Amino acid sequence: LDPFFLTNSSQIPGLLKRLDDEISSGHPTFDGFIDDLQMFQDHRSDADVVGLKAKLKHAERIDEYESAEQKKELFAKLLLRLQHYPSAQRIFALFLARINDVFEHHITPHVTDADMDRRKVDEIIESKIILPTLSDMGDGFEHFTINHAHVRGMIYWLAERCFVRWK
């Protein structure tokens, strides 16, 4: 696990504790989205390849499409269920920012490199996104856990909004 990609160890556990308190109080406390999450809610308009299916096809990953749609929807439902809790929004914003950063700096600029094949991209996604995110979440708690499918769903959700591209 690359320690550079782990969120400050105090951020996620503290946010999870606050989220547990927010949920236990019995009522959502927030309408709208915090700025850090709103940025990802809005679709980018400068993309030349639009839509998840088109992006996967362009990246020669169309075989992932059905699974990608399911995982994207799984994450979208989780986001919808927890969107009224500020701490959940902060957690999602941190994870989405990590995904965006890894793609912007470690994947997309290097797609033409000779050694940047699909396997290498998948290794980067696993080591710099999925494993650190699951590690940050720890055990989660009864109201909020994240698994591999949720994290991949976040990637596909961002791809749909034109923040992530494999090529």
Describe the function of each predicted region.
Residues L1-K17:
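Long, low-complexity intrinsically disordered regions enriched in small/polar
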Residues I12-K167:
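Long, low-complexity, intrinsically disordered terminal regions
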